[in-house]
A protein has these predicted regions:
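C-terminal motif of bacterial Sec signal peptides marking the signal peptidase cleavage site
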Residues: 15-18
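Compact alpha-helical subdomains of small soluble proteins
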Residues: 54-124
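Sec-dependent signal peptide recognition
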Residues: 2-9
Length: 124
C-alpha cells in the first residue's frame, strides 16, 4: 500500500512540474510575441508619421526572428495583425506639431484585443 501511495505521489509531483514548466515556456513565448507586436506597432506608426524616421532602421525585430522561440508563421501573423489593427489605437495630440506615438503604442500593447489575438495565435 505504501508503494502505491509513493508512486501516486511521484506521479503528482511529475505532472505538477511538467505543467509549471509548460506555463513558464508559454509565458516566455507570450512575452516575446507581445514584444514583437510592440516593435512592429512603433515601426508602423513612425512610418505613418515620418517615413524617414530613425526608427525605420531599428533592427529590434530581428531579435524576435532569430532569438525568440516564435515560429516564422507566428511572427508573420502578428505583423499582419499589427499592420491592420494598431492604427485603431492612434491618439491625436492637442499640439499639431507633435504626435502621440508612445502613448498610442502603449494603448495597443496593453489592449485586451492584442492579448486575445496572441493567445489565439500561440495556441494554433
Amino acid at each position: 500500500m505504501k508503494h502505491i501511495q509513493m508512486i501516486a505521489m511521484m506521479c503528482v509531483i511529475c505532472v505538477t512540474a511538467s505543467c509549471t514548466t509548460q506555463k513558464v515556456a508559454y509565458r516566455e513565448r507570450f512575452e516575446d510575441a507581445k514584444g514583437y507586436a510592440l516593435y512592429a506597432c512603433i515601426a508602423h506608426m513612425n512610418k505613418f508619421v515620418d517615413s524617414t524616421s530613425f526608427i525605420n532602421i531599428d533592427y529590434s525585430g530581428e531579435y524576435f526572428v532569430q532569438l525568440s522561440s516564435l515560429s516564422l508563421e507566428e511572427i508573420i501573423r502578428i505583423k499582419e495583425y499589427v499592420d491592420k489593427e494598431c492604427m485603431n489605437y492612434w491618439s491625436i495630440s492637442q499640439n499639431p506639431e507633435g504626435n502621440m506615438i508612445a502613448y498610442s503604442t502603449w494603448k495597443f500593447y496593453n489592449s485586451k484585443d492584442l492579448d486575445n489575438f496572441i493567445h489565439k495565435t500561440l495556441r494554433k
